[in-house]
Amino acid sequence: MIQQETRLKVADNSGAREVLTIKVLGGSGRKTANIGDVIVCTVKNATPGGVVKKGDVVKAVVVRTKSGVRRNDGSYIKFDENACVIIRDDKGPRGTRIFGPVARELREGNFMKIVSLAPEVL
C-alpha cells in the first residue's frame, strides 16, 4: 500500500527515476493507494534531458507494490518493489516505454496503453 511520503521507483522512460507521493486521489479521506490507483507525486530524482525534471509535480498510476493485492480467485500477487508510471490527464503514459512487469488490475482502471506497452502482464 502506498501512502503519503512514500517513495516509488518510476517504471517508464519519462526521465524521472524516483518520485515521492504527495496525495492519493479518489475520495476525501483516502489514506492508501494500491495497484491501479492514481497518485500525485513530485519528482525527486531525474535523468538529464528527460521529459520531466526534478521538482515537477506529476500524476502517476501505481503498477507494482510490495504489499501486493488479492485477486477474486483467492490468489495474491506481490512484487519486489513499489513502482509507478507517470501519466497524462487522458490516462496515457508520458514516456514511450514501460520497464518491468505490471499487474492485470490495470485493465480494470482503463490504463490500456500502459498494459499494451508493458513487456509482461501478470
Swiss-Prot record:
- What's one GO BP annotation on this UniProt entry? translation
What are the recorded GO MF terms, alphabetically?
A: large ribosomal subunit rRNA binding; structural constituent of ribosome
State the function annotated in the UniProt record: Binds to 23S rRNA. Forms part of two intersubunit bridges in the 70S ribosome.
One GO CC annotation, please?
cytosolic large ribosomal subunit
NCBIfam families per UniProt: rplN_bact (TIGR01067)
Q: What protein does this entry describe?
A: Large ribosomal subunit protein uL14
- By its UniProt entry, which Gene3D superfamilies does this protein fall under? Ribosomal protein L14
Q: Does the keyword DNA-binding apply?
A: no
User: Belongs to which family?
Assistant: Belongs to the universal ribosomal protein uL14 family.
Q: InterPro entries per the record?
A: Ribosomal_uL14 (IPR000218), Ribosomal_uL14_bac-type (IPR005745), Ribosomal_uL14_CS (IPR019972), Ribosomal_uL14_sf (IPR036853)
Top-level lineage group: Bacteria
The entry's keywords: Ribonucleoprotein, Ribosomal protein, RNA-binding, rRNA-binding
Subunit notes for this chain? Part of the 50S ribosomal subunit. Forms a cluster with proteins L3 and L19. In the 70S ribosome, L14 and L19 interact and together make contacts with the 16S rRNA in bridges B5 and B8.
